[in-house]
Amino acid sequence: MQKKLFCFGLGYTARALISHVAGEDDWTIAGTCRSPDKRDKFARQGIECHLFDGSIPLRNIVDALSGVTHMLISTPPGESRGDPVLACHGNDLSRLTNLHWIGYLSTTGVYGDHDGGWVDDETPETPTSRRGELRLAAERDWLMLAESASLPVHLFRLGSIYGPGRGQQEGLKSGRTKKIVKPNQYFSRIHVEDIVQVLLASMAHPDPGQSYNVVDDLPAPPDQVIDYVCDLMSLPRLPDVDFETADLSPLMRSFYSESKRVRNDRIKSELGVKLKHPTYREGFAALVK
């Protein structure tokens, strides 16, 4: 069967997924980006790319979505219009008849703050940040469209993403990283290769309407991870910076307002995923070797 993947948003995770399927004869790839320069770059890589910034619909949407069998959504929701793909093209998507799989990339932020406690795939969503509220609203809008139009939507709640060119190893190289210390602060992480594993497993075994926590096996305090990566890179450990007095942007401070440890049982029990990088230790060791 000929398959066509369309990615609304050709960011870090989408490009990683594309790199795994682009070389296969039965896949064609298309997607959207926000600038002509990026469009031209993707075109040189053989990716059919359309300009879309979420403010106005694609003029050639029928042609763009012709033959699409799989769709990945990684565009973030906005304050005024919610999910930009649904706002601009919800009706167009509802008329597609050949879609086998839709993946919506969300965030574990929909669970809110749990004071360092555990959450799992069944934990009720209780976002405590505006960012989490917008993501949860977008998730629900996608599921509503899925129900009304019988679309195979799947939700992927991602932890903090790292991988080649992205993560603590890059911040340490550039000198941007600060070791913020806050008691009982936990973040869950996921290597981009394992996100791709999960997406491919879901494509192979669709379960429309299902949600998955996409994180590794070991949530950890951010300062602990920074120390570990410093040691791997043979760098001196950074000085502790107390969260209460740290000079942080409002966005960064908002991340530290939530602490939880996220379980990943469903990607293993239902999709059969065996993580390549089960903890940050294996993941960063592979990146800096």
Residue map of PLM features:
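N-terminal Rossmann-fold NAD(P) dinucleotide-binding loop
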Residues: 14-15
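C-terminal amphipathic/interface module of NAD(P)-dependent oxidoreductases
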Residues: 52-56, 254-289
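NAD(P)-cofactor binding segment of oxidoreductase domains
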Residues: 61-104
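Conserved Rossmann-fold NAD(P)-dependent oxidoreductase catalytic core, especially the SDR/UDP-sugar
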Residues: 90-130
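Catalytic helix-loop patch of NAD(P)-dependent Rossmann-fold dehydrogenases
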Residues: 115-155
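Glycine/proline-rich active-site loop of Rossmann-fold NAD(P)-dependent oxidoreductases
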Residues: 136, 149-151, 161-172, 201-212, ...
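NAD(P)-dependent short-chain dehydrogenase/reductase
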Residues: 143-187
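Mid/C-terminal beta-alpha module of Rossmann-like enzyme folds, strongest
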Residues: 205-252
